[in-house]
Structures are given as C-alpha cells and as structure tokens.
C-alpha cells in the first residue's frame, strides 16, 4: 500500500491558489462544492453577533480537511460543535498514528488480507485505529472515573481534548483545539463509534459509570434558545 500519509490543509492570507491545489493533492478525500454559498454563510457567521454552530460528519476528520476545521476553531469562528462519534475516533487516531492515500477502486478483499481498512480513498491500517484508541483511552477513563461517576458526554470529550494535547502531535487535534478554546463538542450518538465502544467496554467493569444523555440534550437546548 501507499505509505504517503494524509496531511492537513493549512492556509493564510498569503496562500496562493496553486499552493492550495497542491495541498488538496496531499489531503485525501477532499470534495469542493458550492463554494460561493459556503463563503456567504461564513461571511454572515463572522459579521453577525450570533452563536455560531458548526456541524459536520466524521469522514472529513479522516482527511486533510481536518486542518481547515482546526483553523475555524483557531480563528474563533465557532462557538459550539455538533458532530458524530466518528469525529472523535478519527481525530484521536490521527494524532496517535497515520492514515494513508488509497483509491476508491482498490480491492477491499486484498486490503482486508493486509489488515487495511478503506474509507473512500483513504487507507486506515488496523494498527492506526482501534488498537491505539483503546490503549490510549482506557487509562484516561480510569482517571475520569476516579474523579466522579456521572458525566455529561461533552464533559468527557473536553477532558479527552485536554489529554490529547499532551501527545507529540496533539497540536493537530481538533478535539484538543476545542478543549483549549473552551468550545463544547456535542455528540448526539456517543456510543456510535470506536470511542463510544471503549466507553461501553469500560462500563462493563464499572457499572456505576454513567452518561447523562438527557442532561446534555437539555444543556444544548439552552444554548440554542
């Protein structure tokens, strides 16, 4: 398999279009659409006095587009994040290991024999996903459990964000940047992913460890209204 790692996109006021296109080639999974509409929405978000929600699916965290989401946080363009558990999975995994370039037409049976998973045109080796997440997360859950037994999911994601910043590549983490900026991350389906599976696994031996789903939903409603 190709061992060229997926890289984040980084732009600033001096970035040339040719440089951006070059970065697209290293980002993996990028699809550009409705740029004009997106620009208008972003303009309104920046200029108007409002609470800015950013919501997106997990797949872009597996690509270099994560770098753009990071810059949204860095530049104070988001107040609240609503996303899926997969966002936590891919963000944490890519701090601990690399994802690689692949192709949509690759043979999944052959990849499986090599211990490689395919996410569109991004390749995720087994050693880059479930295993490192489990090894990293379980000791942290023990620490959190020792502090208290009852958690709102967003509180756990905040704690994980602070912890991931301690890793060598922690500065690349979206979750870490949100934690540093005190931006709350809401995941309506907290068990629907690798991180969620680790929470469930931890609960097997800590049955008084609980997630306050309804309390979090009420808190999110208060922010909206």
Protein language model features and the residues they cover:
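Conserved catalytic alpha/beta core of Sir2/sirtuin-type deacylases, generalized to analogous enzyme cores
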Residues: 1-56, 62-225
């Amino acid at each position: 398999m190709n061992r060229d790692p997926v890289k984040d996109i980084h732009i600033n006021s001096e970035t040339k279009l040719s440089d951006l296109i070059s970065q697209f080639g290293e980002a993996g999974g990028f699809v550009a659409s409705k740029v004009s509409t997106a620009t208008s929405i972003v303009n309104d978000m920046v200029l108007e006095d409002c609470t800015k929600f950013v919501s997106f699916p997990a797949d872009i965290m597996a690509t270099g587009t994560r770098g753009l989401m990071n810059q949204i946080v860095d530049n104070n363009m988001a107040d609240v994040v609503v996303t899926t558990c997969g966002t936590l999975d891919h963000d944490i995994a890519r701090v601990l290991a690399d994802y690689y370039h692949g192709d949509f037409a690759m043979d999944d049976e052959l990849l499986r024999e090599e211990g490689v998973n395919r996410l569109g045109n991004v390749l995720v080796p087994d050693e880059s996903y479930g295993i490192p997440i489990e090894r990293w997360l379980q000791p942290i859950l023990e620490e959190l459990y020792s502090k208290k037994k009852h958690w709102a999911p967003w509180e756990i994601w905040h704690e994980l964000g602070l912890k991931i910043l301690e890793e060598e590549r922690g500065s690349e983490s979206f979750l870490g940047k949100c934690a540093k900026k005190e931006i709350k991350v809401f995941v309506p389906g907290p068990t629907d992913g690798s991180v969620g599976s680790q929470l469930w696994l931890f609960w097997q031996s800590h049955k008084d460890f609980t997630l306050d789903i309804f309390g979090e939903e009420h808190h999110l409603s208060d922010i909206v209204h």
